């Protein structure tokens, strides 16, 4: 036969390698003193570490997302603030433009400030020709000169008259408003006072009616109670008279001895009607008492005899117990002596056996090669 190198089956090789790896893992798990003695679960610890790392990664992602969102919100807020500032600027600019462009037409009206000394500095003052313009060297106008002072004074007077009339009208309207408010307040106060007086009158009338009704009810209740008291007193007097009459004619005060006897039980008496015992009854009771004393005396003597007998019996039992204790002590001492001799013999035999083991059996000491043959496999 020829020696041929046959190709092994890959699945068989994979199975052999898997068994070899499992055996190595099993040996590492069994021969690891830390895992075997302390019981540390490495897989559980690794799982906990991975879980903690995963949780920390999730928290970091949350923090990053929160920071990104916060930055986005800040940017949006800044944009909104900028837009609001621009809107306010445009609004103020439009207001200013409106004032400059549209409110110049009121310079010749009542709203024009006639007391402004610089209001005519920007106008050209023609003297001879209406449309001609002369410079300062022409000496046609001077700084601070008012060529239309009369018209300006008239306009100022009209403005003052208008302002005065307006102030007078406002003051008159304010006085009329105050008068109307005062009149309305007086009317409201008068109505409130009238309403309060009416309510007070109604309350007083209600109180008077309640007092009258309460007084009538109290009178009726008092009359009813007086009638009940008179009837109760009359009934009590009648009951007292009946009780006195019954006591006077009763067997208790008449001392009738027959009333103490019961009809259905002659040997029994009625305690509340009994007047005492007769001489025969007292003699019978004394005789019975004497008999009872004699019986009691005999009973005490018999009890004394029984107690004396019990005392003697207890004494004999105590003596027997002392004898038994003495015998028990002697037996225990003899047992201890026998046990001591037996233990000495047993110690001698054990010492001889140990000497034999040390001198004959345990002479060969194991070497390192002896210990290496153990724990070579996990099976």
From Swiss-Prot:
Q: Where in the cell is it found?
A: Cytoplasm, Cytoskeleton, Flagellum axoneme
Its cellular-component GO annotations read: axonemal A tubule inner sheath; sperm flagellum
One record GO biological process = flagellated sperm motility
Q: Which UniProt keywords apply?
A: Cell projection, Cilium, Coiled coil, Cytoplasm, Cytoskeleton, Flagellum
| Pfam families, A to Z | RIB43A (PF05914)
Q: Which residues form a coiled coil?
A: 154-252, 283-335
In terms of superkingdom, the source organism counts as Eukaryota
Q: Which family does it belong to?
A: Belongs to the RIB43A family.
Assembly and interactions? Microtubule inner protein component of sperm flagellar doublet microtubules.
PANTHER family xrefs: RIB43A-LIKE WITH COILED-COILS PROTEIN 1 (PTHR14517:SF11), RIB43A-RELATED (PTHR14517)
Q: State what protein this is by name.
A: RIB43A-like with coiled-coils protein 1
Taxonomic lineage is: Eukaryota, Metazoa, Chordata, Craniata, Vertebrata
């Amino acid at each position: 036969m020829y020696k041929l190198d046959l190709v092994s089956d890959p699945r068989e090789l994979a199975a052999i390698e898997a068994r070899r790896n499992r055996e190595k893992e099993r040996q590492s798990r069994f021969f690891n003193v830390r895992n075997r003695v302390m019981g540390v679960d490495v897989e559980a610890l690794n799982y906990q570490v991975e879980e903690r790392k995963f949780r920390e990664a999730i928290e970091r992602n949350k923090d990053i997302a929160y920071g990104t969102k916060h930055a986005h919100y800040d940017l949006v807020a800044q944009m909104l603030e900028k837009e609001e500032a621009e809107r306010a600027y445009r609004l103020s600019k439009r207001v200013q433009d409106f004032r400059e462009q549209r409110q110049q037409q009121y310079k010749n009206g009542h709203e024009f400030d006639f007391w402004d000394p610089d209001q005519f500095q920007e106008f050209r003052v023609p003297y001879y020709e209406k449309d001609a313009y002369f410079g300062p060297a022409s000496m046609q106008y001077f700084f601070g000169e008012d060529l239309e002072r009369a018209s300006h004074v008239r306009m100022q007077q009209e403005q003052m008259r208008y302002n005065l009339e307006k102030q007078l009208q406002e003051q008159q309207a304010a006085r009329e408003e105050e008068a109307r408010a005062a009149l309305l307040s007086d009317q409201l106060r008068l109505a409130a006072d009238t309403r309060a007086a009416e309510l007070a009158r109604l309350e007083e009338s209600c109180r008077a009616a309640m007092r009258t009704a309460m007084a009538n009810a109290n009178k009726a209740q008092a009359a009813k109670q007086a009638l009940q008291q008179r009837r109760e007193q009359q009934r009590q007097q009648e009951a007292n008279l009946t009780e006195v009459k019954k006591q006077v004619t009763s067997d208790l005060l008449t001392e009738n001895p027959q009333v103490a006897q019961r009809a259905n039980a002659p040997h029994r008496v009625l305690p509340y009607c009994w007047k005492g015992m007769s001489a025969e009854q007292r003699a019978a009771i004394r005789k019975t008492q004497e008999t009872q004393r004699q019986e009691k005396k005999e009973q005490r003597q018999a009890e004394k005899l029984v107690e004396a007998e019990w005392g003697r019996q207890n004494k004999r039992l105590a003596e027997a117990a002392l004898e038994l204790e003495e015998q028990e002590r002697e037996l225990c001492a003899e047992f201890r002596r026998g046990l001591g001799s037996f233990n000495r013999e047993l110690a001698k035999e054990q010492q001889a056996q140990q000497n034999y083991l040390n001198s004959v059996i345990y002479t060969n000491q194991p070497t390192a090669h002896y210990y290496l043959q153990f724990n070579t496999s996990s099976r």
